[in-house]
């Protein structure tokens, strides 16, 4: 899922300071699951904004807080918010950057304030309360060849053909040895599975055209004009 983190309150207050009417919108997708941007966090942010304005002696503030199913879906975002957004000049979004941009596109006359920083695509370890980056959406997945461990993301240099000379005792030289070397993990995994032929396979440099930004997917393919 998309991993995000709430921005420092000072930053949110600064972006919202000129508005007397604010709509705070959470997202029931990724940011809600990781307890950063759902209904509950929207209500908490509402209380904090009200408190901040009171402390500054500025009493006139109307805030509504709610959450919608997904902010990254054009139709869901526009149908869920169409009636409520009209009463507010600004919306504070607790969704990832995709949600914020979807709202900005659907409601171009409103100021959309991002309240979270989008970090990465990652895995949640609920027990440890940690998130780990696992995929960089490279557009050409090679996990089948690497024992389900992504070298593009988990190797600090995104190497494709085994470890660099910097690994020491299974640890990566980047990051002061705190992370495992992805290629040692891959080697061990493939060895366990008796698949070391995949480890020695030579992989050509990647074709980065598949991950040029901005990418698109789906829709009807354009019909090519036939030459007369
Ligand atoms: S190879 Fe890695 S970055 Fe590419 S799609 Fe697979 S998991 Fe994601
Ligand atoms: S030590 Fe391992 S994980 Fe780190 S950059 Fe080299 S190959 Fe990649």
What feature does the model see in each segment?
Residues 99-102:
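Short, well-ordered alpha-helical microsegments
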Residues 1-67, 75, 79-91, 105-118, ...:
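Iron-sulfur (Fe-S) cluster-binding modules
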Residues 93-97:
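N-terminal glycine-rich "phosphate-gripper" loop used for MgATP/nucleotide binding
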